[in-house]
Each structure stands twice: as C-alpha cells, then as structure tokens.
Amino acid sequence: MRYFSIQAKGWIQWGAFGLCALMAVIAITIGFSIQETPARAALPNVPTHLGVASCSGSTCHGRSEADGKIVRQDEIMRWQEASSPTGAHSRAFAILSEPRSQQIARRLGIGNAETAPMCLGCHAENAASRGPRYQQSDGIGCEACHGGSANWIEVHKLGNHANSVRAGLVPLESPKVRASVCLDCHYGSADGGQFVNHRIMGAGHPRISFELDLFSTLMQHHNEDADYAQRKGLTSNVRVWAVGQAMAVERSLSLYSNPSLGTEGAFPEFTFFDCHSCHRRIYDSQSFTPTTLDNPGRPIPVGMPPYNDENMIMLSAAARVAAPALAQKFEADSRAFHAAIAKDRASAVAAANRLRGSAANLASTFQSASFSRAQIFAIIDTISSEAISPRFTDYEGSAQAVMAV
C-alpha cells in the first residue's frame, strides 16, 4: 500500500463514481494488508512498530509537496519514490517477489523468499511487536531506522527532538548511531536473517559493501537547514564517512570472530574474504599471466585468499591525516591480522580483537573530530597518492576509493 495526501490548495475533482471506486479500492487494500500482517501483542521492553501509515498524515510526513515550515513534510513521498534511490527502502520487500529473488531462494532451498527468515531480516522491518497499521509489505519503513514509535510518536509531534530521543527515537544524526543501524543490513549482524554469507551470494545475491556517507546521501529524505541544525546540529560529510569506515571495520571483525559465523563447515566463511582473489581467470597455458599483485598491507603467503580490507584501507587514509597518533597502531594491527590468518583461527581471532579495538578508538575519535578543509583535501590526496594506492590491488578497495572522492 502506498501513502499520500491531497492538500487543501490542490483538491482534485472527483466524480461520484470515481470517488466511490477509490474508496472501495482503499478499503479492499487495507483489508488485505491487515490480513497479510496481523498485529502482534506488545512485548516487554520491545517498542511496538506502528507502521508507515502512522507517519503519513498530511500534517506530519505525508504531504505531496515539500512546503512544511519545519521539515519538508513530503518524506513519505520521497521514501516511496519508485524512480529514485530515495525509494529503495520502500522496495525492499517487493523485490523478494521478483524472479531473481525467487531463484536465489530456490537455489538455497528456503522456500518462498517473501516468507523466508533469511530474507526478511533485512527486506522487512525486524519488528517483534506490531501495531494494527503495520504492514510487512512496506519493506524498510520509518521505524526500521528510527525505532519502534509507540513510545515516542506523540512526543515527536510536539517538535522537541531531545524529548523524542529520550522517549526512544533513535538519534540518527549521530554518525556512530547511524552507522550501527545501517550496518545491520548493509554489512550484517549476528541477529537472525541479517548476515549474508557466501552461500547466499553464491546463489545470486549481490555483493555487500558499505560506505555510510554515500548511502546516507542517496537515502536522504530531509533538508539539513537552519532549523535542522538548531534541533540536531550539523555533522560534516567527512566525519560521517570516517566514522562509517571505522565502524564497518569493527563490524566485519566482530562477525568474523563469532564462532557461529566465521566458519562454514570445514571452511572459513568466504564472505569475509576478497571476492576477486578467487574469482579470477585461470590460465593453464604456457603463456601464464599473473592476475594478482603484491599488496603491502597484506603480509600473507602467495596463493592465500586475503581478507576483504576495503574499509581498512580507507580508515588508514583517514587516520594518517586526522588521527596520526592512532594511525601507526591501527596499521600495525591491520598487518598483524592479515598475517595471523595464515596461522590458525585462534591466532586470527585474537588479532581481529586487537584490530577491532584500534578501529573502535578511531570511531570515537572521529565522532568528535572537526575536519578542516585542509584535512579533507589531505585525506583525498592520501587516498590517491603512493602512500595508499599500492593497496588498491582488487575491485573492492578501488570501489571504496571512488566512493570516497
């Protein structure tokens, strides 16, 4: 079901038949929606998700034009825009019915993708407690990111952001908070249905990559103007990018260290490793041409698949400029982690924990850092210079460099 409102200044003239037909369609749609996703009783300490419909009034976020005095008020329209990246979240559930998704589900043997927990963890809101207007078909709705609204929606209507946060609204203006929320689906979490392992990608799922600032920009439904700054403060794009890189490294290492996720049978979980280290052309002829390059950041034996270090490379560039006191330790821990993978899993997990601590320190440092214009250009120069560019030996790291600059 899509959400919209018709404002007083732009009434559309309907004939009696047309109006009756519209009301009938809406009634039928609502009836099917309620049947499709029944309400779930509120659980202790679990905020109830009221659904996108609870935000879609014309005095809230459901206008058809961005003429609100404080916020745009057309956020729902932007969220459901079919032709724009801003509407991607609203399409998350619908995509499960498409042929590619159904083929992936068949290859995995998990039944219908629209009901498989492996898919619903990220293609629908992970809402344990649901109000009567919640619809799973809304995909990733407002509360998937802003948090279940039952405890804060009435406070939110009064316009005091700090009070809304105290009532349970997720403060996504904080780069660390936003990164944590986005990473759950755009990188993975240990919660059910939120980890894309190599089996899922082998069945046809797209590769997973994460860049917080770019993703935030593509998804943005609001304007960061003067009154936004007054309510929430402003955060520079570079700070969002740097914190996102640090927390992506943290999340990756945390999942790798998880004994239930880090291995798959007798093998390591390949999703953590550089895709193109294995997905390369094989030469059997005498005119063999090497398809790999030495990488100074990965002290590993020839022929061993390297860990996917795309976010580590970007974090090194940011740290060298904005946190030089921490950069040396982070890079030493990074090299030690790559080397430990060549030993055994216990050594690799111990090294991963040390590297994760270094990344966490950088995330906290960048969270409060003020990136000057000179530092921003220095980071760009570092990414493209001989200091870092020799580490771009594979697609993943190179793609991160493009997204960064």
Task: Please place each PLM-identified region on the residue numbering.
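Mid-chain, structured segments of secreted extracytoplasmic proteins
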Residues: F93-P132
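N-terminal secretory signal peptides that target proteins for export/translocation
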Residues: M1-I12
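N-terminal module-boundary/linker segments of secreted carbohydrate-active enzymes
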Residues: R40-G57
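Signal peptide processing junction and immediate N-terminal pro/mature segment
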Residues: T29-A41
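Short cysteine-rich clusters marking metal-coordination/redox-active sites
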Residues: C55-G57, C119, C142, C182, ...
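Bacterial N-terminal signal peptides
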Residues: G18-T29
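N-terminal signal-anchor transmembrane alpha helix
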Residues: V52-I70
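Primarily the internal scaffold of c-type cytochrome electron-transfer domains
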Residues: A39-L43, S64-R106, Y134-I140, G148-Q400
